[in-house]
């Protein structure tokens, strides 16, 4: 569920402890307990330290306790640097003595098989019984850099953020990635407030620490490495709070290359994998995704250093026509919007630039800056003052220390004391150029991130600017309950699915079910020729593969003959499939084939998939995911982002298609999924989209109902 498991006060006993017990303390070089104890002493932990080792009386000038039973009651946090077999009993003893939090380094739990999972569940039970926060097992520990609390077994570079400095909080399921990210940020002059590696998450997960970081006044951005969210609804609640608090969450989540499940019952199940579902749901909560660790650090830097997040419509100051062309290519590849600027719509720029330099975006000032370096200040200021522009990039040839010395001071001057509510980012175009550190530090001091390459800057800006284009409002309508759903279960064949969905306003062609040839002929006459005949059985997921679809039947005799042929085809395809009968349906005019499907994930909730469909849907995968919170206008915008969207708009003289009707269908299916958790999947494929004003028609329907 979405409820918080721990209060901030409970997490405080882990991340702001007043007392720490080191179980397995040592002075043996390389021992986990030795490094941990040395960290606490070296960085002058302000609270009480209680080393525990049955064979020692003193370590680093501290009294050593021989067993947990000797410890005072109510210690805030205990860190276990002991072998796995001793962990459970030790945790239980600590819980009984009122210890508030435990860090478990030891591996060999859920990742090690059935026995390890059993022990991990026992840890979870102890935590639940005593209200204890357990970090791990199989984790690197945690560090509060602000209050200098290093509860980790690796040597720590304790860089405490100066008072008033914006800092990032790290919540990572990988201890190594948490450490690497902190290491990557420090040379950039960026600070970490607190870092937590959650490991196997026996009793606390990343969502618990995000909740704490949202309320932490020393944290301004939250960076995450996540492999699997075990409590999605709780994380969504935490992400929603972070967005409301103005604290961006930047997440690196591997998994987009995972193969879809081949055994899925419908196209939708095969295509809407967990990664895509997760990303769709979290994007609506304001989460920003990175594709690489470097990109995670780059996005974090802009979010921390700049005075505001990038908006849509980027403007670029450049110094080369050739590089201007490359900028267009990079921007198009990553979906970054470059605002159009010209002499007519940008009078402020026109007044600044010499006659031989046209106003454009990127603005190419050529080598003018070497002789008139104040041009950098003037142009960048004009771009920042333009309300149409959401972010500005100085794309600069750095060359050498002398050239940098001419250019950098005039770029730094733009923000030195300025109050622009949009980011200015420096992007070198000559990665590897020798640039004195003092110039880079000067940029950073006034809030200008420095990137050695244009592409890195563009990608990070694109990820952040995308947030400004998202419709995060909850515009969901009332959930729709399907009458008669209690009478079906498992895979629901087409004819029954249409019987259930048609009364809700889902557009299907006229159709009738028939169990024998004469009934089929009578149905065809009632509907009106020509008709299509389709085999019907719960076990027949892909009718066309089995020869179970015959088109354009025009007479009673053709219908009777088709009935026999379909039964023969299906029997030849798979003798185990027993047909319920056939569906007789009116042949309608053809058009562009789309797919509309939906999935009710037991953890993430409902999501609707839509895009270009037909038998090639799983090959082309030109689809998008939509959530029930989106209204028809937001869905339309999403549909027009599909790769084949020009077809929807009208291509090569063809009419524009009824995207509005398709969007309404998607919204309706989303409301159906929201109102019926037992519907695991719906697949409408194909859905024919007709010219604008003529609507859509779902030609096939399949449902999966599970209770």
From Swiss-Prot:
pH dependence text = Optimum pH is 7.8.
Keyword tags: ATP-binding, Ligase, Nucleotide-binding
SMART domains in the record:
CoA_binding (SM00881)
What domain of life?
Answer: Bacteria
Q: Return the Gene3D superfamilies for the record.
A: ATP-grasp fold, A domain, ATP-grasp fold, B domain, NAD(P)-binding Rossmann-like Domain, Succinyl-CoA synthetase domains
Class of this enzyme = ligase
Keyword set includes Thylakoid = no
Q: Which Pfam families match?
A: ATP-grasp_5, CoA_binding_2, Succ_CoA_lig
* Reactions mediated catalytically: (E)-ferulate + ATP + CoA = (E)-feruloyl-CoA + ADP + phosphate
Q: Which InterPro entries match?
A: ATP-grasp, ATP_grasp_subdomain_1, CoA-bd, NAD(P)-bd_dom_sf, Succ_CoA_lig_flav_dom, Succinyl-CoA_synth-like
Question: What's this one used for in biotech?
Answer: Catalyzes the activation of ferulate via CoA-thioesterification, a first enzymatic step for conversion of the lignin-derived ferulate into high value chemicals, such as vanillin and bioplastics.
According to the UniProt entry, its GO molecular function terms are: ATP binding; metal ion binding; trans-feruloyl-CoA synthase activity
Q: Among its keywords, does the record have Metal-binding?
A: no
EC number(s) from the headed UniProt entry: 6.2.1.34
Query: Which ranges carry the ATP-grasp domain?
Result: 498-549
- Please tell me where ATP binds in this chain: 267, 524-535
Family named by the database record? In the N-terminal section; belongs to the acetate CoA ligase alpha subunit family. In the C-terminal section; belongs to the acetate CoA ligase beta subunit family.
Q: What does this protein do?
A: Catalyzes the formation of feruloyl-CoA, ADP and phosphate from ferulate, CoA and ATP.
Describe its partners and assembly state.
Homodimer.
| Protein name, UniProt field | Trans-feruloyl-CoA synthase FCS1
Species the sequence originates in: Unknown prokaryotic organism
What's the encoding gene here?
FCS1
């Amino acid at each position: 569920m979405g409820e918080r498991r721990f209060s901030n006060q409970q997490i405080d006993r882990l991340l702001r402890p007043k007392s720490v017990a080191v179980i397995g303390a040592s002075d043996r070089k390389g021992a986990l307990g030795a490094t941990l104890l040395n960290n606490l002493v070296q960085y002058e932990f302000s609270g009480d330290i209680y080393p525990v080792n049955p064979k020692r009386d003193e370590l680093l000038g501290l009294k050593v306790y021989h067993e947990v039973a000797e410890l005072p009651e109510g210690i805030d946090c205990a860190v276990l640097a002991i072998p796995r077999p001793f962990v459970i009993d030790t945790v239980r003893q600590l819980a009984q003595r009122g210890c508030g939090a435990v860090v478990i380094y030891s591996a060999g739990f859920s990742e090690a098989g059935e026995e390890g999972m059993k022990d991990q569940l026992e840890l979870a039970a102890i935590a639940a019984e005593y209200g204890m926060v357990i970090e791990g097992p199989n984790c690197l520990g945690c560090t509060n850099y602000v209050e200098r609390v290093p509860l980790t077994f690796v040597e720590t570079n304790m860089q405490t953020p100066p008072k008033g400095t914006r800092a990032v909080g790290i919540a990572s399921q990988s201890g190594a990635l948490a450490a690497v990210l902190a290491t990557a940020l420090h040379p950039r002059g960026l600070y970490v407030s607190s870092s937590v590696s959650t490991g196997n998450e026996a009793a606390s997960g990343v969502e618990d620490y995000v909740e704490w970081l949202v309320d932490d006044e020393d944290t301004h951005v939250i960076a995450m490495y996540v492999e699997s969210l075990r409590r999605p609804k709780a994380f969504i609640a935490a992400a929603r709070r972070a967005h409301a608090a103005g604290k961006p969450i930047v997440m690196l989540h591997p998994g987009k290359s995972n193969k879809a499940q081949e055994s899925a019952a419908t196209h939708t199940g095969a295509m809407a994998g967990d990664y895509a579902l997760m990303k769709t749901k979290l994007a609506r909560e304001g989460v920003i995704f990175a594709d690489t660790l470097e990109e995670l650090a780059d996005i974090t830097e802009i979010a921390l250093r700049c005075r505001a997040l990038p908006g849509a419509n980027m403007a670029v100051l450049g110094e080369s026509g050739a590089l201007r062309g490359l900028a267009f290519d990079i921007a198009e590849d990553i979906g970054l919007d470059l605002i159009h600027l010209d002499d007519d719509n940008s009078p402020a720029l026109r007044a600044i630039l010499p006659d031989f330099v046209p106003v454009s975006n990127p603005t190419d000032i050529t080598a003018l800056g070497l002789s008139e370096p104040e041009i950098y200040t003037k142009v960048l200021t004009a771009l920042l003052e333009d309300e149409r522009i959401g972010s500005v990039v100085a794309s600069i040839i750095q060359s050498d220390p002398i050239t940098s010395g001419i250019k950098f001071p005039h770029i730094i001057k733009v923000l030195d004391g300025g109050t622009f509510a949009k980011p200015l980012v420096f992007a070198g175009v000559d990665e590897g150029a020798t640039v004195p550190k003092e110039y880079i530090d000067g940029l950073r001091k006034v809030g200008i991130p420095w990137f050695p390459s244009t592409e890195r800057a563009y990608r990070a800006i694109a990820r952040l600017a995308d947030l400004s284009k998202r419709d995060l409002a909850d515009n969901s309508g009332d959930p729709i309950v399907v009458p008669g759903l209690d009478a079906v279960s498992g895979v629901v064949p087409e004819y029954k699915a249409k019987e259930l969905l048609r009364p809700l306003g889902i557009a299907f062609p006229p159709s009738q079910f028939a169990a024998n040839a004469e009934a089929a002929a009578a149905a065809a006459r009632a509907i009106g020729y020509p008709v299509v005949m389709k085999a019907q059985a719960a076990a027949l997921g892909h009718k066309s593969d089995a020869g179970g679809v015959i088109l354009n039947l025009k007479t009673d005799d053709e219908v009777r003959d088709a009935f026999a042929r379909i039964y023969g085809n299906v029997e030849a395809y798979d003798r185990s499939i027993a047909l319920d009968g056939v569906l007789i349906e009116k042949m309608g005019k053809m058009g562009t084939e789309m797919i509309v499907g939906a999935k009710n994930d037991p953890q993430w909730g409902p999501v609707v998939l839509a895009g270009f469909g037909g038998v090639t849907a799983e090959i082309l995968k030109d689809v998008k995911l939509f959530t029930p919170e989106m209204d028809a206008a937001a869905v339309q915008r999403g549909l027009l982002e599909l790769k084949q969207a020009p077809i929807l708009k009208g291509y090569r003289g063809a009419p524009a298609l009824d995207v509005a009707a398709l969007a309404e269908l998607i919204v309706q299916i989303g409301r159906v999924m929201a109102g019926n958790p037992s519907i695991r999947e719906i697949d409408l494929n194909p859905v024919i989209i007709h010219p604008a004003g003529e609507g859509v028609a779902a030609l096939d329907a399949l449902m999966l109902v599970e209770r």
